[in-house]
Regions:
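Bimodal "functional hotspot" detector
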Residues: 1-289
Length: 289
């Protein structure tokens, strides 16, 4: 009798231990889901959306959002800009010549120096290439100026956005030049910056709105031609823009495309951190830099 009780006690203890071990060693469905989610998050931890400038079918540089590994953004951006890179959208192209190597680079107090191999000289459109490299790297907040060396020899020095992009020269008098960059869209809905050099003594924001209401070859603007900039003011790093009702569409909404066209253009011309959009003096939307 005692032997039977002892055996029964051992059996119950063993069974209990087996059940406990089973619970702790076999994950539940919920635990599997949590683990999988954590792995997915870990996989994209080093990626962030950045903008670079690639070439469209009309040979214009376009602003292109792309995921870039944050471990070495400068090197990765240069790789994306190189011809025959298969990681960019099929409708776009790079422009740094094939086989060009970034030999080294260094960043000192927001001044970036790039040292390329001699293949960089093989570019068929050096102005486009230099604008594209400059604008792409200046999208990084820790870079303000760029110099480009080829085999350790300085070639392009102190580059910034003042060099312009997709430049259009529309002036007749060199002595009264105004330079302003306008952002349009192309047929694939990529934003296309065009730096215009003109004889126009209006304030830059007025030129931006006037140009966005007019047509441009191979480019699109969604700003209604009846839109009027009633008034504007800059205050505490904010640019207030007050429009008439034609800023809005028939549904009383301001489309994202219209907002971005204006905002990108303003941020290239004004050192402000925010744009406040108003319609007939009523605040409707704001955009941060």
């Amino acid at each position: 009798m005692l032997r039977q009780k002892a055996l029964r006690k051992i059996f119950i203890t063993t069974l209990t231990m087996f059940i406990i071990l089973t619970i702790y060693t076999i994950p539940t469905t919920q635990n599997i889901k949590v683990l999988r989610t954590n792995l997915e998050i870990k996989d994209i931890t080093n990626l962030g959306t950045d903008n670079i400038y690639l070439v469209n079918n009309n040979n214009l540089l376009v602003k292109t959002p792309i995921f870039i590994d944050s471990k070495d953004k400068i090197k990765n951006i240069i790789n994306y800009l190189t011809i025959d890179n298969n990681k960019i959208p099929v409708s776009l192209n790079g422009y740094i010549p094939k086989n060009t190597k970034l030999l080294d680079y260094y960043l000192d107090e927001k001044y970036l120096t790039l040292n390329f191999s001699k293949e960089l000289n093989n570019s068929k459109n050096k102005d486009l290439m230099i604008s594209g490299i400059t604008y792409s790297l200046l999208e990084l907040s820790n870079i303000e100026k760029i110099s480009i060396l080829i085999d350790n020899k300085p070639v392009y020095i102190n580059l910034d956005k003042s060099i312009g992009i997709n430049n259009e020269y529309l002036y007749t008098n060199r002595n009264k030049l105004t330079k302003v960059t306008i952002y349009y869209l192309d047929n694939d809905n990529y934003y296309v910056p065009v730096t215009k050099y003109l004889n126009n003594d209006k304030e830059k924001i007025e030129i931006i709105i006037d140009e966005l209401k007019s047509t441009n070859k191979n480019l699109i603007s969604y700003l209604n031609e009846k839109t009027k900039l009633i008034d504007y003011k800059e205050e505490s790093n904010v640019l207030f823009l007050n429009f008439n009702e034609y800023l809005e569409d028939p549904n009383k909404e301001v489309t994202e495309k219209v907002l971005n066209e204006i905002a990108y253009s303003v941020f290239d011309s004004y050192n402000v951190n925010m744009i406040m959009f108003e319609v007939n003096s009523k605040k409707i939307k704001y955009i941060n830099r």
